[in-house]
Amino acid sequence: MKYSDYRKNIKAGDVIATSHRAKWYKSWYDLKISVVRAVTQSEYSHVGLVVNWGERLMVLEAVEPFVRIYPLSNIVNEVGEFYHVPMPFKIDLTGSGAFDYALGKVGQSYSQIDAMRSVFTRLKDDAKWECAEYVQAFLKVAGVDITDGIKSTPTDVVLALMRLGAGCILV
């Protein structure tokens, strides 16, 4: 499915997930992600939050070296495909304070150690982030707590949202 045709279905508050299924390793990053996917036996290697910035769809995400706001179209150009995880219910981004909360984390550090640790245990609350932990924290402020009993991996986030009725569409 072409992103340009599907784009209209993506709304603020939705989650995107990527798999990063590179057949050829172009960088050290490609190799690291492939190793993580193999060890965790996960389909998903990354998650982020969709927000609107005027007419643009942007993604709030925790990546090396910090939490950032990044155009979804750039992610599409870089990874080729992604999964759209539409929320099965309306999320109040502004009234709940979730949007301000997420924006307040922009520029904070990404923790590669936390990303590795998240496979085995729940993460402690600190000022360093990994992608799934960031999405979970945002959703909790928005009134959707998916932290109970799950670890902070991209796959855990996607599966928890699917249990609540979210879809998962390959774009």
Label every PLM stretch briefly.
Residues 1-171:
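Cysteine-nucleophile amide-bond enzymes
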